[in-house]
Amino acid sequence: MDKVYDKCCGIDLHKKLIVACFKQGNRQEIRDFGATTRELLEMADWLKEGGCEMVAMESTASYWKPLYNILETCGLKAMVVNAQHMKAVPGRKTDVKDAEWIADLLQHGLLTASYIPDKDQRELRELVRYRKSLVGERARELNRLQKMLEGANIKISGTIRDINGKSARNILEHLLSGRQIDSAEYDILYEKKVIAHNLKATKEQIIDDLNGVMSALQKKMMRILLNHLDELNAHIRELDDDIDNFMKPEEKEAAKVIQDIPGIGNTS
C-alpha cells in the first residue's frame, strides 16, 4: 500500500503516560513520555528534529487537548481521530502496540481526522461554555432566592416580573434593612423609584405581597445569596465583553443577521 507520509507519529494517550511511535520510512522508534508540559515540549522537540510531517492521536477523554495545543504552538501538524474508526480498520496484529497501529494507519492515509476548530475558535467556545455554566448557576441561585422569599411569605414574584432586576433588588435591600412597607413608606419608595412606576399590581396588593416575616438567619442567607448573584452578574458581563472582543468582524455581522430570526438574541 502506498505511503502518504514518510515521517509521521502515532500517539497513544493516557492520563500520565504518552507512548509515541515515530515512523520514518520502514523504520520506527517508540518512546514513552510523561504528561507534564516539560515532557510534552520534549516530545515536540523530538518530532521536530525528526522532521515529522503529521501526528495522530485518539480523542481520549480530554487528554488530547494539552498535547494538541502544544504541538500546534510548536508548528507541528496534528490530527485527532475517533477510536471507533480505528477499531473498524481490519488487519491489526494482536502484538502491535496502540501507538504503532495509529502510526501505521496514519502513514498509509487510513485515518479520518475529526474536526478541530482553530485556536481562536476553541478559546471562543471555552468562553461561551463557561458563560453558559455561570448563567445556569445564576438561574439556580434565583430559584433558591424565590424559595427563600416564599418561606418568608414575601410574594415578590406576584408583584415584579424580573426577580433579578433593579426594582426587585431595591425592594429586597429595603426589606433586609428590617423595615416593613406601609402606605406612607410605599409612597416614599414610589417617589424615589425604589418601587417601579410600571408595576401592574395595585398599591394595596404590593404592600400585602411584600410584607413577610424574615428571621435573622433568613436575612443572613439572603444577603449571602444576593452577594453571590452580584458576583455572577459581574462575571457574566465580563465574559460578554470578552466574547465580543474575541469575535471577528464578520462573525459579529453574522450574529446581527441571525438575530432577525424571532427568538434568537445576542446570547443565544
PLM feature spans:
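A detector of single, family-specific signature residues
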Residues: M1-S268
